[in-house]
From Swiss-Prot:
Leukotriene C4 binds at residues 52, 136, 154. Modulates blood feeding of female sandflies on vertebrate species by binding and sequestering different mediators involved in the host response. Binds leukotriene C4, leukotriene D4, leukotriene E4 and U-46619, a stable analog of thromboxane A2. Does not bind histamine or serotonin. Inhibits platelet aggregation induced by low concentrations of collagen in thromboxane A2-dependent manner. Residues 1-19 form the signal peptide. Thromboxane A2 binds at residues 49, 63, 154. It is found in: Secreted. It comes from Phlebotomus papatasi. Keywords: Disulfide bond, Hemostasis impairing toxin, Platelet aggregation inhibiting toxin, Secreted, Signal, Toxin. Belongs to the PBP/GOBP family. One of its GO terms (cellular component) is extracellular region. GO terms for molecular function: odorant binding; toxin activity. It comes from the Eukaryota. Its main location: secreted. Disulfide bonds join 36-66, 62-112, 162-178, 174-221, 211-230. This is Long form salivary protein D7LC.
Amino acid sequence: MNAVITSLLFLSLVGLGYSWKYPRNADQTLWAFRTCQRRESDNNILKKWYTWELPNDEKTHCYVKCVWIHLGLYSKSKKSLRVNKIEKQFTSRGVAIPSDLKSMEGETDGSCKAIYDKTISFFNNNVADLRTAFYGTIEESNKWYSENPDAKPKGTKISKFCKDNNREQGESNCKHACSAYYYRLVDEDFEPIYFRLLEIKGFSNEDIDECIKQTSGRQGCQSSDALYDCLKNKNSAALKAALQILDDQSARTY
């Protein structure tokens, strides 16, 4: 699974871009944090990340880069953070824009260490406000979920949630409108998430490119159906195995 994710990440960053809507909600930020945390097995490190401690070590450097990517806040082409979107997240949450936000501007060399170095001073100065802005506390996260009962609850499997109430149909009598989004094969606009797809073991870059092309011209959740069907036709067993892993994870931490 890690190999699949790595290849997906590579493809998205060197190929297609993505630009998610801002502000992000608590479901979307939680997905970003948990996806990146699952790549680490050292419980001592994970405990620090869970409490928003970012020590100066190699694993944390890449964790920071991973989170910025999965929040849609890192531009591969410019090798820089999307500071205007960070500002929008703060504003949307009623949090004052930090005076040192502009310190996050500017190109990096794209390495984990460079992105960490660009981030850490701002992070240390504003960690409490960052946690509020990005729903990084249990209280803020739970408040959002209580106010948004249509979102998949924490601790509920994606498969169960999407099966209930015919959620898979979406608004266009689709087959995978709900699960394709919660597995993050597609974004909230049903556009393929290139780096996510590259993470799926058993598919070549060419397979992913071809399946993304199958979505061209499709509207709404019909695009996610076309993507899913293409992947299934390419390698049904690999797709099933990958989604089973994601489904099991969704019952534990997302």
